[in-house]
């Protein structure tokens, strides 16, 4: 049975490993560590005593922004991202958050998950994300009313 708990200081090496595997242009370890604190709701997904995913979300008043969500590739496509996202949304709602924002690469297959969970496309940021080959890719800005 998967567990969802708050991220702790000792989790960062594993989070960084997942980040490197799961994203086209991953965050650095420093960026992961810098996105922590009282304005954040950061969760880890544990299965069989191992962290297999995480979400990093910043809250400001009644809005939140999901900065990063990642599931280890071996566990993708099994509903784990949906489970983590649903728990995050539930905890945000309990804290009085009304709107959850995110941006996602146009090519990211997770877009279907966000749409299925109630997110709507709000805007396109042209040439926002870098690609490994030196090019750029659009970001899709999405919002969900909790």
Functional labels for PLM-detected ranges:
Residues 101-103, 115, 120-138:
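Conserved catalytic-core motifs of GNAT/GCN5-like acyltransferases
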